[in-house]
């Protein structure tokens, strides 16, 4: 049984069958860069980061493209408000976006194309649409004639008749029909502009993604993703202009993330009910934010509450405590010559939970269900460590290997597992613990306390239990 994805286009789950064997080509709509990213944006990019990570974990080569819309009405408006050059404004917020995604441990896309660097490609694409009879020039720009594309509405279910009643269409003086949308906007005074066969101007919003995705992923590719709010009009219009140009199916699977909700309303800039990524990172670690997002399936609405974030923080601490318990137990572990009933119980619990994890992720990347399996392993291994005098090294390693998979797929615990010289570090820590133990015996408590304090600064906490001392890693605040 392979990976199943929910395809917005067909409104059902389908087995993922990439166009090229062993490779998934994926395009995710990137930001319009005029302001700081908020949690609603982060939710989408964390979700697609985990989807990509899981596909790579399952052995696929993933080619991922994410665009930057660096010229747009919103950018021009913000630049006019601030007196900043639109290009410099966009450049500044591209840097902000990349910094925020890096802080959230979102892996970089393979290619980040920008609209302003693909103007010639966009012009060529529009020329093809005109040649094929799908586009026309009006007084204020070039438009796509929606009624010429017979499959319009197949993604969103919207009907042309409804659009003609004035629902969710952009204004335009030169349109033939209300539903038609701009491919090229003729220049207005003071706006950025480029030469074209239709006079100076700039691209419309929808044409950008069709051009840039196809340039790097081909005229047909596997996955196109974004937030639910992009289904109409953006993705619907992308399909229309792309399939009109190429004459065949453009994208095989359409994936969309649910909204982040605040007291029953969508988190958005327009409502002013948003919290920026930077504000969140002042209060919570990147891993807490990732875990908060992953506690819900990517297609489900995600309620933003402080209680929810605190719950994620507590859960993350539980998992880190489990990792430390395993590490400490490894010191006392023994090789397996014979298994007891409790050994078998622990092994079976890990095996069953591991299967549940993969089953959940194979079922449209259901991170909420997969996390339940993670906590099943956590509970089982903690119980095992408490109940046996000498845990079996092989069982502890199986639990640790499972958590490494979780780290790889969910983007948590990465620093914990990245320490290449961990073995040497542990030997040095053990040596310092022994030196401190001797100092305490000699009642040289000032030096013993100095070692404890210096180790604490490095994230190593010592706990004295009678004559013995146990150490564990902690987050340095």
UniProtKB/Swiss-Prot annotation:
A motif ('KMSKS' region) lies at residues 266-270. GO terms for molecular function: ATP binding; cysteine-tRNA ligase activity; zinc ion binding. Binds 1 zinc ion per subunit. Coiled coil: none annotated. Keywords: Aminoacyl-tRNA synthetase, ATP-binding, Cytoplasm, Ligase, Metal-binding, Nucleotide-binding, Protein biosynthesis, Zinc. InterPro entries: Cys-tRNA-ligase, Cys-tRNA-synt_Ia_DALR, Cys-tRNA/MSH_ligase, Rossmann-like_a/b/a_fold, tRNA-synt_1_cat_dom, tRNAsynth_Ia_anticodon-bd. This is Cysteine--tRNA ligase. Its cofactor is Zn(2+). Its EC number is 6.1.1.16. It is found in: Cytoplasm. PANTHER family: CYSTEINE--TRNA LIGASE, CYTOPLASMIC (PTHR10890:SF3), CYSTEINYL-TRNA SYNTHETASE (PTHR10890). The lineage of its organism: Archaea, Methanobacteriati, Methanobacteriota, Thermococci, Thermococcales. ATP binds at residue 269. It comes from the Archaea. GO terms for cellular component: cytoplasm.
């Amino acid at each position: 049984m392979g990976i199943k994805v929910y395809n917005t286009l067909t409104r059902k789950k389908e087995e993922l069958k990439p166009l090229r064997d062993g490779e998934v080509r994926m395009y995710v709509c990137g930001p319009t860069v005029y302001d700081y990213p908020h949690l609603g944006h982060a939710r989408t990019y964390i979700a697609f980061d985990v989807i990509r990570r899981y596909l790579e974990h399952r052995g696929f080569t993933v080619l991922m493209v994410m665009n930057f819309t660096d010229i747009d009405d919103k950018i021009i408006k913000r630049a006019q408000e601030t007196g900043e050059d639109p290009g410099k404004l966009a450049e500044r917020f591209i840097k902000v976006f990349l910094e925020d995604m890096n802080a959230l441990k979102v892996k970089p896309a393979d290619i980040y194309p920008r609209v302003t660097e693909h103007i010639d490609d966009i012009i060529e694409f529009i020329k093809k649409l005109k040649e094929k009879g799908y586009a026309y020039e009006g007084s204020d720009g070039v438009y796509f004639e929606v009624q010429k594309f017979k499959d319009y509405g197949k993604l969103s279910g919207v009907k042309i008749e409804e659009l003609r009643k004035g629902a969710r269409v952009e204004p335009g003086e030169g349109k033939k029909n209300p539903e038609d949308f701009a491919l090229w906007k003729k220049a207005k005074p003071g706006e950025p502009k480029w030469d074209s066969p239709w006079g100076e101007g700039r691209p419309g919003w929808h044409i950008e993604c069709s051009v840039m995705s196809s340039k790097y992923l081909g005229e047909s590719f596997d996955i196109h993703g974004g937030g639910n709010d992009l289904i109409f009009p953006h993705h619907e219009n992308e399909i229309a202009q792309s399939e009109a140009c190429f004459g065949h199916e453009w994208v095989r699977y359409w994936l969309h993330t649910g909204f982040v909700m605040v007291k029953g309303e969508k988190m958005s800039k327009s409502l002013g009910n948003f919290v920026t990524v930077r504000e969140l990172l002042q209060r919570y670690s990147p891993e807490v934010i990732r875990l908060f997002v992953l506690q819900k399936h990517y297609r489900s609405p995600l309620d933003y509450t402080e209680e929810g974030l605190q719950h994620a923080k507590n859960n993350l601490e539980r998992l880190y405590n489990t990792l430390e318990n395993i590490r400490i137990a490894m010191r006392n572990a023994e090789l397996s010559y014979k298994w007891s009933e409790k050994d078998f119980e622990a092994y079976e619990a890990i095996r069953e939970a591991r299967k549940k994890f993969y089953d959940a992720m194979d079922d449209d990347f259901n991170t909420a269900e997969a996390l339940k399996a993670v906590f099943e392993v956590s509970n089982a291994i903690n119980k095992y460590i408490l109940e046996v005098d000498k845990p079996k090294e092989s069982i502890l390693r199986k639990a640790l290997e499972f958590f490494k998979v979780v780290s790889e797929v969910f983007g948590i615990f990465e620093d914990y597992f990245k320490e290449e010289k961990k073995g040497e570090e542990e030997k040095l820590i053990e040596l310092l613990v022994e030196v401190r133990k001797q100092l305490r015996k000699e009642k040289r408590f000032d030096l013993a306390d100095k070692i404890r304090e210096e180790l604490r600064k490095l994230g190593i906490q010592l706990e004295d239990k009678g004559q013995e001392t146990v150490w564990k890693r902690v987050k340095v605040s």
